[in-house]
């Protein structure tokens, strides 16, 4: 039971970081493009707060892709993206508007059960983990798919996964998938 409580705490810290990165992304874009952003904004009739974690993933992934042109992802400077979280404190967060996010908590608790005794899929060892390790150790390599064909068809998800190699369990990589699955279930 202690392990599940630890996973729950770890997931919600991860979720809050993605939420704040997504909100910072919206705030930055509203300043750059002079948009009228406010917490009551809706996207196709849906509260914009629901989209913050996915936008945070988008923002983080694109930052890591650009960063990897110059430096490997294991460089400590890659964590500077987390400074964007402080942009949230310049604009107040209306906690009563976060009720929609709080309604998704049971969905994520149920999804966290998939984290118990999880193992790698066979193609993780075939090329995903090797590709992610390469992204961590070096900046972008021209002709990367000439080394091994599947390396050339990787996506921004590989950059995100490589960045999340913070512990030996690779649980944060699994949490990334849970955010997408939970986002899908919020619309059902």
What are these regions (language model features)?
Residues 100-115:
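Internal/C-terminal transmembrane anchor helices
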Residues 39-40, 96, 137, 158:
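Glutamate identity and glutamate-enriched acidic tracts
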Residues 22, 45, 56, 61, ...:
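Residue-identity detector for glycine
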Residues 73-81, 100-101, 123-127, 173-174:
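Short, aromatic-rich membrane-interface segments at the entry and exit
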Residues 38, 100-104, 129-134:
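Short hydrophobic/aromatic-rich motifs at helix boundaries and adjacent loops
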Residues 1-95:
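Membrane-embedded, hydrophobic transmembrane alpha-helices
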Residues 112-188:
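Active-site lumenal/periplasmic loops and adjacent helix-entry segments of GT-C-fold
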